[in-house]
Amino acid sequence: MAQEVIKIRGGRTLNGEVNISGAKNSAVAIIPATLLAQGHVKLEGLPQISDVKTLVSLLEDLNIKASLNGMELEVDTTEIQNAALPNNKVESLRASYYMMGAMLGRFKKCVIGLPGGCPLGPRPIDQHIKGFKALGAEIDESSTTSMKIEAKELKGAHIFLDMVSVGATINIMLAAVYATGQTVIENAAKEPEVVDVANFLTSMGANIKGAGTSTIKINGVKELHGSEYQVIPDRIEAGTYMCIAAACGENVILNNIVPKHVETLTAKFSELGVNVDVRDERIRINNNAPYQFVDIKTLVYPGFATDLQQPITPLLFMANGPSFVTDTIYPERFKHVEELKRMGANIEVDEGTATIKPSTLHGAEVYASDLRAGACLIIAGLIAEGVTTIYNVKHIYRGYTDIVEHLKALGADIWTETV
């Protein structure tokens, strides 16, 4: 069966500007949240990625009128109807689990296929289920392909998450906005995307306090009205392009950035010795290799993002000594390592820590196992000698708007082929 691949001839120096898209991890929660509205919602600044299109299609399966035009989505929930959501769409992306919280909040029941997405090792949704049960829901998990969630009534509850989880924090918020009384989420995730979803819900009339802290309080309301809302910029896309610019940029400017959201990466760049100039909503970066070797440990926000440990890895081949990367969030998130070895990388993984030594990369055929691994391989291809061919590019398109076109515009020798 024919498939698209990305090909890169490495060694080009990049120059120019990139406008960063809206945040994927906000958009994939805010789109399901629109079904909580009574009426019309308009979203602006959405990333143009496949996950967004899939979620819009799921809204349409609930008889919601949804019109996606570039970065704008208009939604009309006037004729909404509850329905079992098909497994083939749901299993294509993990963020479909936000339909659970939103549908539970709106209808008090939902039947939904089990969520998919990137295979990153164990990623249970037990904290989501714990939250739903605390609000009064009963969960039927007897099926191997779908889940039934139902509540006679949703009542506010005090919920302590056993681990910090962005998905669980948001999903509980979605279910709790229509619950009777107050819901308190302790040990809540503090990520900017959590704040963005809370701000969107508040713009529709929800009563939410404390988003961005470890304690979020939601006072249930009877109705949410329509709203117009602009999604925040994508800090992971911004971080990825920062890594690209540091790897092979001469003068690259990134626009539409919230500097505070990427300050952990900016600080790590200072350790590495990357030239970074931050101004308001734009960042200018250029390659200043060889870099200093560093240690990186992923943590929950505001720590170093797990989504950036793969994209920053190719930079570490350009350092003057061995670097160490430990992923405490997803210890199995190292499927990119074997692919980098095909390119001649001197890299080993032991018990959740990668040891990365200075290496000269050469072009090879490699496979993107997940979204951020794909970004890592693109950066590796940009600095490698010769031509790199990347397979499984569907993962890359799930999270990056027009990445091939953006890189071409910067001067990269990159193209797609059908093989």
Curated annotation (Swiss-Prot):
Phosphoenolpyruvate binds at K24, N25. The modification 2-(S-cysteinyl)pyruvic acid O-phosphothioketal is found at C118. SUPFAM superfamilies: EPT/RTPC-like. Its EC number is 2.5.1.7. Gene3D superfamilies: Enolpyruvate transferase domain. Pathway: Cell wall biogenesis; peptidoglycan biosynthesis. GO terms for biological process: cell division; cell wall organization; peptidoglycan biosynthetic process; regulation of cell shape; UDP-N-acetylgalactosamine biosynthetic process. GO terms for cellular component: cytoplasm. Pfam families: EPSP_synthase (PF00275). Belongs to the EPSP synthase family. MurA subfamily. Cell wall formation. Adds enolpyruvyl to UDP-N-acetylglucosamine. This is UDP-N-acetylglucosamine 1-carboxyvinyltransferase 2. It comes from Staphylococcus aureus (strain MSSA476). The lineage of its organism: Bacteria, Bacillati, Bacillota, Bacilli, Bacillales.
